């Protein structure tokens, strides 16, 4: 077996940290990783909100093209950015162990919680976070905030906003824990499907022996089961990264609990339900939960969201 593993990644500091983390893990098993930096559409277009650009493969398409061409062996994605319908011949080889999944309130100012600071100007590029803010903290003012993590923090410190809502995992990986003011409640801010973990994508042409070694090193079975249910839920709702859908599966003593839902752009309509599942029926139960929500009115909320995004 050829021990070289070419790892495709975006070029941001966070993406490189993730790729280097994967590389370090692979080195422990005698593999020889090489990191290949690839620019994506989402990295190049920074003057528009994510919802205006579109939701299909913004941060992944170019990586998949290189997988298909055989110039890289695996691609490292933030699992929440990986579209639910993969291109032909592509598959998820591994899901890494999950970090803390919470969204966090980030600021350079002496503030503590969202509740105690109702008039903050909050920066975020996520339609899910914006919609949940409108539901639970309707008095908050929001501004769109694009760019890599360092750019967004710089913009905040220069006065573009008082605080930002971001994923804990990225802040922690980049060493910005001192800027985290509050870990937001999972009762209010349920994360995006796959948040806090990495998805390792490969092409079906990858050498089977090499694929098995990579999977054995990187895959966390419990996280894979949880993310499988979350992605099945998201896929059934047809929710891309510009649709405010949330999903989180948590391992319990003998099974898992999946909580999933959708919120309208203005925060006034909110559906959320739960379902239990096991490793054997994770995808099936994710589909079932989404189907129940669609029957309960999620289809109407989705139609309203898509109409609203097309006008914005």
From Swiss-Prot:
It holds the Pfam family Porphobil_deam. The modification S-(dipyrrolylmethanemethyl)cysteine is found at residue 241. One of its GO terms (biological process) is protoporphyrinogen IX biosynthetic process. Its cofactor is dipyrromethane. The lineage of its organism: Bacteria, Pseudomonadati, Bacteroidota, Cytophagia, Cytophagales. Keywords: Porphyrin biosynthesis, Transferase. It catalyses: 4 porphobilinogen + H2O = hydroxymethylbilane + 4 NH4(+). Tetrapolymerization of the monopyrrole PBG into the hydroxymethylbilane pre-uroporphyrinogen in several discrete steps. GO terms for cellular component: cytoplasm. The keyword RNA-binding does not apply. One of its GO terms (molecular function) is hydroxymethylbilane synthase activity. This is Porphobilinogen deaminase. It comes from the Bacteria. The porphobilinogen subunits are added to the dipyrromethane group. Its EC number is 2.5.1.61. Binds 1 dipyrromethane group covalently. Belongs to the HMBS family. It is an enzyme of class 2 (transferase). Monomer.
């Amino acid at each position: 077996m050829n021990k070289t593993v070419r790892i495709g990644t975006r070029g941001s500091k966070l993406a490189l940290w993730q790729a280097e983390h994967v590389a370090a893990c692979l080195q422990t098993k005698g593999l020889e990783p090489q990191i290949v930096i690839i620019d994506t559409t989402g990295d190049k277009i920074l003057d528009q909100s994510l919802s205006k650009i579109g939701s299909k493969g913004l941060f992944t398409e170019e990586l998949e093209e290189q997988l298909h061409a055989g110039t890289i062996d695996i691609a490292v994605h933030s699992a929440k950015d990986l579209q639910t319908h993969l291109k032909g011949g592509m598959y998820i080889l591994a899901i890494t162990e999950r970090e803390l999944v919470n969204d966090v309130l980030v600021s350079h100012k002496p503030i503590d919680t969202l509740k105690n600071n109702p008039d903050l100007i909050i920066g975020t590029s996520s339609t899910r976070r914006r919609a949940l803010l409108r539901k639970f903290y309707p008095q908050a003012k929001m501004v769109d905030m694009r760019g890599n993590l360092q750019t967004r923090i710089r913009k905040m410190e220069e006065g573009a906003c008082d605080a930002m809502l971001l994923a804990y995992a990225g802040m922690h990986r980049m060493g910005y824990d001192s800027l985290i003011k509050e870990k937001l409640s999972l009762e209010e801010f349920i994360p995006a499907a796959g948040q806090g973990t990495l998805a390792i994508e490969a092409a079906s042409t990858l050498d089977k022996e090499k694929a098995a070694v990579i999977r054995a090193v990187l895959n966390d079975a419990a996280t894979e089961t949880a993310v499988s249910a979350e992605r099945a839920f998201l896929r059934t709702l047809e929710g891309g990264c510009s649709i405010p859908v949330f999903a989180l599966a948590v391992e319990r003593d003998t099974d898992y609990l999946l909580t999933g839902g959708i919120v309208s752009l203005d925060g006034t309509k909110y559906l959320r339900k739960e379902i239990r599942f096991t490793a054997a029926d994770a995808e099936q139960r994710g589909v079932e939960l989404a189907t129940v929500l669609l029957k309960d009115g999620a289809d109407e909320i989705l139609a309203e969201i898509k109409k609203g995004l097309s006008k914005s």
